[in-house]
Amino acid sequence: MDALMANYGSDSDDDNEPATVAGGAPEPQEASVLLPPPPLDLLQPPNFVDYSTIAQGSRIRSFPHVEGNYALHVYIPVVIPFNARKQLTLVMRRAASLVPDLYAVDADYALSELCKDEQKLEKVLLGREFHVSLGRTVGIQVHQIDSLVAMLRQKFQSQQRYWMEFNKWEHFVNDDSTRSFLSLEVTRTGLPEISKQIHMVDEVYRLHGLPEFYKNPRPHISLAWALGDVSSKLKQATKEIEKFENSINSSKNCNLRCNFSRIVCKVGKKVYDICKIGD
């Protein structure tokens, strides 16, 4: 998840060379006086949040690393609307009390620790970008990248905006049972459109010899995860969450609606826009 950082030599590296006077002898330089660094508190804004103090979970690669291969993921980016975050904050606090060993997806911080500070919970968990997967996350070779991206862009060149409603709390387990997820699923509004887009991605995957998506796809965003298969815990937790949600909201289900506006293809650390619908 962390971006790779590349170090480049400065264009002004030569400025650090000793000056040369006539005759070729280097001119002696005065020893510089090193000042002590300023207090760290002065370098931090008033609303600074130190996320490094929060316990982190263990990361597990979902497929073996192969030299020369890059992880491919095609998805719809989702940002939770501000008007839905207050209720979700309450729900995630409830989830953390029901399943203490949950972690925030991608951020990988312990949910129970995040819940101690509302600012941390909203910034680390709810303020990030989520995704609805349109294809399996698989490894591809470098020579496949250009062809795959070009075909995806051609497939999705005439997409239109539509609504997605994440209306059902559900739990999922990955293929090798190393992780379980607490998720919000799309079961009504937006399901036909997303299912069609998954089929289109499958067609491109098939042409590149890649495994297709699940036979009966269930579009969702995952908010938290736990190590191993904890289906029984999460199944019971989703029932309790629905009861809790009904007690604080007159509507029957979670009212999280987002507009579809973009599809992204991530290969390794590089992100390609497949389609983007303007306002």
Positions of the model-derived regions?
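Histidine-dependent nucleotide/RNA phosphoesterase domain, centered on the 2H-phosphoesterase fold
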Residues: 2-279
